[in-house]
């Protein structure tokens, strides 16, 4: 007998009989799994059986389970591509197939599923997970993956590693899942009779949080916390501190835990190289985060339950999270070929100074990654980006390779944008398949991805999508959001009161999609109306049904010709099939594009008046309160954001396939957003109506600093991006010159000097600002999202916690589950509200009341945003599509690229 067959037979015989599914062989060869994977994915993914999953304490007893320090992977055998070292399971990449063909999901060389490769067949050398020596918890997790996405794990082993990293073991029972505790009770609706006794009990339990005390403290916070915050918003910070204390006994406070094999190799080397200095830096960071951090209850839930991970059975500490982020970014800067130039622009001589600079920006909340990237950066086999824009023409057939690519991306928690009207498949079937799988992912993962479905409104398939949204609301997919690509010809016909609008089949609509210029599109559209088969609809009815879908809260509007007309592309380009899922980033290429978000916290540029000499500087804007806004600090933050973004792009391209590097090198896009704009205005004592000039100045300085930093990188010796000659920058133009010429606050001599340097040296990047929502990042730092106004002084947000029972016997689908809602406090209002019961001193206005002011401010700032601005529209329950249609026409005349990001009931 072959020795390999003998080992396989021994592993099969060691599997307990009660763990084997009836009618299925416990363990099969890799070749058999590969041949049957494409046939089993649909059944295992969509129709998996959850009846065999069992829950209960670990065999080690209640004491071991409640302690919460059992190694998750201590019993995993070292077989079939998985190696066990130091109690940590790590996936080792298999050798390529004999014929040298890459696998369908061999996305990266050194990291997890980044961007799927274009083609090829499934490799036959995929590793399998052997549960022979695993513990009961690990066996449960293996069976859960068989029900949840076993076939995808067989095709893409990095997803298996992603599961091991993203999962957590609860501290109360030892269950393997996504939360640190089980059983969230229904929040109390009334205050307790003796609030002082409740606070004393919380304080007593927090002092003895080891063992089951942390679970008791968690129950008290979840039970009475929301009601206490509604009654007294000031107790939000105290509840956030108690929420952190519930995790103190199980936190890993040593930075040496990041030398684990779960972390990226560059991070491990950096930690081992600086193992003498990092403990002191970690201690200072933990003390700063604990004392200076403004952590309310909702921010604490985001930090501990979305950002922090478990390593070797212990949770990350908040200070350790920021240290890991800083180490990962520093390693990306140092491992780049241009590290010396990056250090020069960061004003750092060696990597220790780079680490201190990056750590200061991260822990202060001045520059922030997305919450998803904050939770995954620095780890091995995980995505290094936030979103994926699917624009690959090879995916038009919507074949198994394309569906597997999108599902693999969703399995890793990354949101995807897909244009279904340009696929050679039934649009409703694709929506059901991707939406159903996305809902399964959202049930299992803390980071809930979405599928943004884009629909071309000149394709006849748009009628089917609209009917699907309106008629199948009972089985609505929670993970699917829609976006309608509205052409200019449709808006012009509605304005001219023309009643006939034509929709074409897929070949004609694709031919129209290749015409990005508005005049060429209208000319070809008129010709096709005369010579091609078409479906004629009423213009008013068609638009009203489209906006009725938008009023359901799951559809956005994109003026697709404005996206091309007011873009940085000088040559004629095709109409982009889709934007990013957050409706902020544009992509004009024909390859899948990963998006890396980076947010600048504008509220961190507001300071108290202490230095009288600095108040007379030209970059200082005095407020009505004892505060001022410093534009020079804002430019410094944007400059560092450009350096960070280029280093992250270098790291992503070095770990990806050649065609991903080629796609990113064309424009080297930086997706820089903002947060805390309304918070900054309230702290300065300004209303939104009186701040239009200040908002325009803020974005002018951001755009100037971004272009200046990109030019300086080329001036230092870096090559310009490949498509620089195809952009308006080659002609010496700036993005605001495509609109009306605004009143610039920066001296014209500085703009002309920048123009001359740009023509001489070029640009390292050609896309800079993308104003997305970034709401989770904003709530993490206690500021308002993006350029949006605050919804109220105290408002509620959904958390990752669910109120349904967690056990399998009481399983509820996603549409029945009720998420726990926690009040969020507007701290800019709370700072000025000195005593309870007195009128507030700051000028606060809720978002629905100043919606028109926010829209006008967006018109002014959009001239400096080279990508898109995502807005929120608040509507009343009695609003009709006619009213929304009139507002949509106004958005079109204001030259918005994205009419609205999402709709919210006021």
From Swiss-Prot:
Any GO BP: deoxyribonucleotide biosynthetic process
Transferase in keyword set: no
Domain of life: Viruses
An annotated Gene Ontology molecular function: ATP binding
InterPro entries documented for this protein: HSV_RIR1_betahv, NrdE_NrdA_C, RNR_lg_C, Rrm1
Gene Ontology CC annotations of this record: host cell cytoplasm; viral tegument
Signal sequence region: none
Claim: Nucleotide-binding is one of the keywords in the record: no
Region annotated Disordered, chain positions: 1-70, 89-129
UniProt xrefs under Pfam families: Ribonuc_red_lgC (PF02867)
Localization in the cell: Virion; Host cytoplasm
Principal location class: virion
Biological role: Does not possess a ribonucleotide reductase activity. Betaherpesviruses probably use another strategy to expand the dNTP pool in a quiescent host cell.
Protein name, entry field: Ribonucleoside-diphosphate reductase large subunit-like protein
Species whose genome carries this gene: Human cytomegalovirus (strain Merlin)
